Amino acid sequence: MKKLVFVPVFLLALLVRQAHAQMYVKAIRANDTVPIKGAIPVKYEGKVEECYEYKDAAGLHLFLATSTSAGKYFLGTCYTLVNGNYVQDWQIKDYSSLEVAMADDYTKIVDIDGDGIYETIIIYEYPTEGNKYGGTTWKLLLHYKNQKYAIRAHQKDSDYDEEDLTMDKTFDTLPKSLKKYVMQYWNKLAKDQNAMEMFDLKK
């Protein structure tokens, strides 16, 4: 008969605190207006928009956002260090015939639910195509437990146009704390852009 091993609550709490104490996020490039701090340890093409090194309970990671062809192609890629080499975990791709630009200083690498694993939030924009009135398309992408969740909005430039806001139905499957955090963060963007009528997500 196997013996049960009981871990004291205080020891378990200590181990959790130690794991969280080892977590960090370091900006190699916070946005495209500041210099790159140090070498980027993966191959890439185009311009580095943002780059972060971060460590959590799953290991050491790198998030790299790049744009190519005058900003028309956008890639957001996450890597994890495995046996001394960075291996791609996931990637976000987007394209505009004009330009795709990240919203400066809005990238979030944060442990929202406190499980020791970082979630990633990125926000970017590009000119709305196929709309005779123009305008801007905004996207927020959350990466959580190997799945992507998106909020999309069309910001109008003309009084003859209509604004539009859509949220992936999969957001309803998120834990309430995560969904609330992301909605509040999106609303912060709305406030910063003076576009509350379009962006304001109801709690």
Give the positions of each predicted feature.
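Sec-dependent N-terminal signal peptides
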Residues: 4-15
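N-terminal "first-domain core" detector
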Residues: 30-90
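Short N-terminal edge-element motif at the start of the domain
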Residues: 75-114
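Acidic/hydrophobic-patterned starts of short beta strands in beta-sheet-rich repeat architectures
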Residues: 58-65, 113-124
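Acidic, small-residue rich beta-repeat scaffolds with periodic aromatic anchors
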Residues: 16, 21-48, 136-138, 143-203
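A short, structured loop/turn motif at beta-sheet edges
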Residues: 108-118, 143-149
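Short consensus segments that form the blades of beta-propeller domains
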Residues: 63-71, 97-99, 128-135, 140
